[in-house]
């Protein structure tokens, strides 16, 4: 489709859509336009393709707006609903070089499977755009599968943002209760498939975003389960910032568990942060974190490059943390590559921190391989063992 303004109205697809090719969508394969409105429409069936596969659109640019009674539902008339492909697979859009907004509640309840890389419950790959999560609703039984770059909402965010404009975290007086935050994704993220079951060897696995490159993540909340093998986090598996101007703030994990039984870099909020520039703060973990090496209540591992001074501020861990090497209540392991003057401030751990193997352990930081840096105005109230 190539036009200035387009609409899909009162449309339902209940038959399977299968292709060995790329750009496969429940409604549209490729959309190139300024505006598209999808109103009172549903995709309720099985969808399979190769690269760029989405329940609504395979590959999209422009502005996509969803309104009315629209949904991607788990079952229609006894049918089986699953969105599957090899790469860039999303519950709604596979490859999104577009904005996607929901005027009314838009419900997604389907399995999403990438057999090679990049799967998201809403978008497989988000490219250079901002996704605002207002009015997107995901079922608690939803499961997103894939071996790499897998997120409950977005598999991979490249030079973009994933935000909720209304969410914020205030830590000025007391720690807010977990129930005061509304979850954006309550389901499960893991490797494996619906046919062979879940597995625990996936990389860059996150409750909201799998892998974020030069992207902001602001004001989001996760309440489900994440299982992976390396770079595993309650909000995001891996963040890599190469440019200035990005933020990771006001994010909450209140999920059941973040688990990594084999590899490294496991965090209640983020598995691995590669920092050169940006703002990091106001992050809370309430969930259980169970990892191997480099395990932390908020961050598993942080690597500081040669850019700005890094400040980690207002981090709170209120979930039990267990690991086998370099385990911390807030951060498991920091490495600096010659960076100096970095700091952790105004942070606190309230829960037990357990090291089941060798290496270091700390109430705030497990191990810091970083020169002339400091921790101040922070406290540990948990049992360290």
Please report, for each region that a protein language model flagged, where it lies by residue.
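Surface-exposed loop/turn motifs in large extracellular/passenger domains
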Residues: 1-385
């Amino acid at each position: 489709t190539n036009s200035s303004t387009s609409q899909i109205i009162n449309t339902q697809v209940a038959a399977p859509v299968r292709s060995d090719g790329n750009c496969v969508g429940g409604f549209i394969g490729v959309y190139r336009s300024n505006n598209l409105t999808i109103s009172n429409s549903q995709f309720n069936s099985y969808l399979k393709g190769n690269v760029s596969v989405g329940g609504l659109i395979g590959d999209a640019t422009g502005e996509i707006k969803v309104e009315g009674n629209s949904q991607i539902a788990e079952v229609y008339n006894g049918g089986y609903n699953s969105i599957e492909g090899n790469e860039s697979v999303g519950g709604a859009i596979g490859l999104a070089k577009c904005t996607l907004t929901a005027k009314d509640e838009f419900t997604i309840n389907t399995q999403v499977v990438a057999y090679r890389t990049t799967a998201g419950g809403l978008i497989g790959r988000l490219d250079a755009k901002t996704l605002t999560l207002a009015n997107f609703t995901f079922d608690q039984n939803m499961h997103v599968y894939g071996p790499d770059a897998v997120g409950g909402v977005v598999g991979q965010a490249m030079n973009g943002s994933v935000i909720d404009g209304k969410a914020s975290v205030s830590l000025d007086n007391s720690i807010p209760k977990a129930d005061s935050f509304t979850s954006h994704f309550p389901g499960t993220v893991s490797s494996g498939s619906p046919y062979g079951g879940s597995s625990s060897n996936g990389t860059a696995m996150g409750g909201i975003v799998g892998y974020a490159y030069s992207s902001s993540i602001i004001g989001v909340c996760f309440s489900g389960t994440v299982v992976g093998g390396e770079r595993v986090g309650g909000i995001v598996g891996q963040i890599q910032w190469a440019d200035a101007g990005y933020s990771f703030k006001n994010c909450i994990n209140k999920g059941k568990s973040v688990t990594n039984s084999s590899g490294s870099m496991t965090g209640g909020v983020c598995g691995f942060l590669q920092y050169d520039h940006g703002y990091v703060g106001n992050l809370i973990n309430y969930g259980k974190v169970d990892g191997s090496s480099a395990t932390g209540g908020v961050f598993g591992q942080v690597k500081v490059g040669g850019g700005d001074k890094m400040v980690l501020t207002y981090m709170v861990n209120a979930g039990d943390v267990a690991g086998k090497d370099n385990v911390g209540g807030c951060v498991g392991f920091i490495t600096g590559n010659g960076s100096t003057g970095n700091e952790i401030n105004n942070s606190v751990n309230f829960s037990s921190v357990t090291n089941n193997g060798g290496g270091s352990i700390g109430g705030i930081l497990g191990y810091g391989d970083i020169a002339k840096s400091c921790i101040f105005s922070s406290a540990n109230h948990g049992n360290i063992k």
